Amino acid sequence: MKKSRKILTLLMVMILVIGSLAGCKKDSNTTNDKTTGNNQKEATDTATPEATNTTPTDVTLKVWAPQEEQEILKEMCENFKTAHPEYNLTFDYGVVSEADASTELQKDPAAGADVFAFASDQTSVLVNAGILYPITLDVDKITADNAPASIKAATVNDQIYAYPFTPNSWFMYYDKSKYTEKDVLSLDDMMAKDLGDKVKNFSVDLDNGWYISAFFFANGGTLFGPDGTDPTSCTFNDEKGVEVANYLIDLAKNPKFLDEADNNILAALKDGTLAAACSGTWNADTIKEALGDNYAATSLPKIKINGEYKQLSNFADFKLIGVNSQTKFAVPSMQLAQYLAGEECQKLRFEKRNIAPTNIKLASDPDVLANPAVAALSLQASYATLQSSIPQMGNYWTPAQAFGAEVLNGTVTKDNAKQKLDDMVNSILSSIG
């Protein structure tokens, strides 16, 4: 009965999260409408081949996915091949992460993948570059099947450009032999606990903009305005931003803190020298194996600034599957992209890799809600900040990484924190040409 109530509670959280994420973001093109509109028209009129009813016999599709997806990708593509005997299909697999898809495609779109996975913050950039093929296959179905926020993340100027398949965010894993459920509500309480000389209490990747932003958002900071659409606004260098910088300086200096680097958290969790670490569902199986019976996952903790507890608010975005506008096989490419992002493959990813679904039906499945990592992701999503997808977002990552690195190496101090934050924000808001 207790388990049933817990699952029902998580189901209610999922419903609220889907609704709240859908409502918290306006159309990502409320600025620069003229430019975006012209670029979209150019992409549609000149760069995008017309879909035809001609069925090619021989079809070769280049498909990109990250390294950790390669095994299951091949299984899914073979299933697609079996289901489509009208094509003589050959697949050319490539290893490109979702984070790097836009960069690699812009080098030479014609040499890029026909079908590829990418992070939703790249949507506007890829559309403006004329690289994404406008989706015309079963638009009503994918809109009805997936969380509204995931559809918004794949949409530019009311046109869907990709198929969503998973929320992309992070939360906290912990060793429940070292922390109680009450302990993990507060990072300050976690760091104050004496777990032994050789044990690090907490780890997060501070020199990574995807992670460090959570601390600024927790204290009321905004990136590109309240709704992420203003390329001229970032408040990370205001008074509250300085408070965050001071908190990060203290955290980095704490001997109980471990900066995440090259997945060093996995070995530390396994040998018992780390009590809690931040990551996503992509590491769920490995961390579960490392922690064994002590495996637990939850939302991010609160941090205490000026005597007040502030909830860490991570970036929330989505992983999408798109089609190259220069593909020679538009219809088969869209069919494959739809299948790879569809309910069957989302379920397969969940079962084999603990990847959370965007499919509404799967998101409410009791097996999904009973999974600790997926449940933690769902809970944290209610505290998350939807990641901006405007082109200016591309300017954020390097300055944020550099600031985090300087916090770690000690060159950011409480005396120069304001100047260092000013430098970071000026770089973030600099013209992208």
Question: Where do the protein language model's features map onto the residues?
Answer:
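A structural signal for short loop-to-beta-strand junctions that line the ligand-binding cleft
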Residues: 106-107, 111-114, 142-176, 200-204, ...
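Extracytoplasmic/periplasmic solute-binding protein
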Residues: 161-165, 170, 188-234, 274
